[in-house]
Amino acid sequence: MLRGTLLCAVLGLLRAQPFPCPPACKCVFRDAAQCSGGDVARISALGLPTNLTHILLFGMGRGVLQSQSFSGMTVLQRLMISDSHISAVAPGTFSDLIKLKTLRLSRNKITHLPGALLDKMVLLEQLFLDHNALRGIDQNMFQKLVNLQELALNQNQLDFLPASLFTNLENLKLLDLSGNNLTHLPKGLLGAQAKLERLLLHSNRLVSLDSGLLNSLGALTELQFHRNHIRSIAPGAFDRLPNLSSLTLSRNHLAFLPSALFLHSHNLTLLTLFENPLAELPGVLFGEMGGLQELWLNRTQLRTLPAAAFRNLSRLRYLGVTLSPRLSALPQGAFQGLGELQVLALHSNGLTALPDGLLRGLGKLRQVSLRRNRLRALPRALFRNLSSLESVQLDHNQLETLPGDVFGALPRLTEVLLGHNSWRCDCGLGPFLGWLRQHLGLVGGEEPPRCAGPGAHAGLPLWALPGGDAECPGPRGPPPRPAADSSSEAPVHPALAPNSSEPWVWAQPVTTGKGQDHSPFWGFYFLLLAVQAMITVIIVFAMIKIGQLFRKLIRERALG
């Protein structure tokens, strides 16, 4: 017992002794070496001890990784050769690395790998071959890697994968195939990956998602298909993925989606569909998704939305349907069921009008963006009962007027953007102008709302207009005036209308008559002038006489 204890202690002390570190390397930790520079073909000449467990090589010169580079390193567990110029790996290079758990050959120039290169690494758990120039992979390359959990083949030039390539990788949890030239995935390619959690296939050239391709991936939580050329998705493609929480389908060529495509995706918390040429959405698309908080449908070809299209997304907080010029109308209940929605982005579309109850039931809405549309008017009750609303963006539309109480009963409102509209500063704007003058702090000063007309008021900020005018005509227009023979009446051209300090007075009709006798008027006018002159002379004469008399009295009193 004592002999065994002493033997273990001696072996431990021997192992704890630092090994001689090669001159071109750094050995900060025991059993670990970090080397940079030098020639790839002369790694064996570095004199690395065979009892190392970690080796990091980077910045190596161009060359072929030789078979004797790691001879005798039977206890090595982590080998990382990255950011170098390795063009190829000789057969048998890793034959002695029987305990290796991590192999990283990232960011090199490797174009091909020998078929049996990895056969001795049965304990390998992580394999990173990303950022190389691989054009193809032998179908038997990974057959012995039964313990592999992470495989990165991203950022290569792969355009084809053998159907049996991953057959024995039953413990795989991460598979990254992004950034390649793949156009399709063969049937059965992912049939053995029941434990796979993350599948990254974005930035390829895939044209379709075929039926059954993903059926074996019951543990999958993240699926990335964005930046492909996908035109079609098989109905029920995601039905067998009960744990899926993140799905990206943005930046593809999808013109339509199968009905009920996401009906069984109850655990989704992230779904992207933006930048697809979607022409319409099916009436039933989403199932109950209690965890989905964001949905973006930007840059599509949608013309409208189905009524209650999002009714099952009860926990949605952010919804964006933007940058879709063909979107010109929305149904009454487009956002029904979104009681938790906080941000609604509808900017940069082609909306010309909005239904009265579009925002009904969105009691927690804080921000709504309707900027850069073609809106000419808003319903009076559009923002009614939105007590949490803080920001409303209506700039860059074609608004001419708004109801005076359109923003009434919004206690938390802090911002209203109204610039770059076609404000018609006539009498009809009066009620809204009254509200605006009481809430100038809410309107952005960088792009203030300005009058588009009429006349001299064009270009003036709304709040710079003068106050109320008693002559502003009522809703039914100005009172009728007695007119001469109707045949002699002719309306004055708007350019000849009288100027006024108020923006709406110009709209009052002005008429002229032909052959009217104004001589009585002028006679009376001159008579008044004559009378006024006579009265003025009499007053001046009387004041002079009074002044003289006053001075005479003063002198007499002074002498007496």
Swiss-Prot record:
Residues 545-560 are cytoplasmic. Residues 1-16 form the signal peptide. InterPro entries: Cys-rich_flank_reg_C, Leu-rich_rpt, Leu-rich_rpt_typical-subtyp, LRFN, LRR_dom_sf. It is a single-pass type I membrane protein. The keyword Membrane applies. Residues 17-523 are extracellular. Residues 421-474 form the LRRCT domain. It is found in: Membrane. Residues 469-498 are annotated as: Disordered. Keywords: Blood coagulation, Cell adhesion, Glycoprotein, Hemostasis, Leucine-rich repeat, Membrane, Repeat, Signal, Transmembrane, Transmembrane helix. It comes from the Eukaryota. Residues 17-50 form the LRRNT domain. One of its GO terms (cellular component) is glycoprotein Ib-IX-V complex. SUPFAM superfamilies: L domain-like. Platelets and megakaryocytes. One of its GO terms (biological process) is positive regulation of platelet activation. Its main location: membrane. Pfam families: LRR_8 (PF13855), LRRCT (PF01463). The N-terminus is blocked. Glycans are attached at N51, N181, N243, N267, N298, N312, N385, N499. LRR repeats lie at residues 75-96, 99-120, 123-144, 147-168, 171-193, 195-216, 219-240, 243-264, 267-288, 291-312, 340-361, 364-385, 388-409. Coiled coil: none annotated. The keyword Secreted does not apply. The GPIb-V-IX complex functions as the vWF receptor and mediates vWF-dependent platelet adhesion to blood vessels. The adhesion of platelets to injured vascular surfaces in the arterial circulation is a critical initiating event in hemostasis. This is Platelet glycoprotein V. It comes from Homo sapiens (Human).
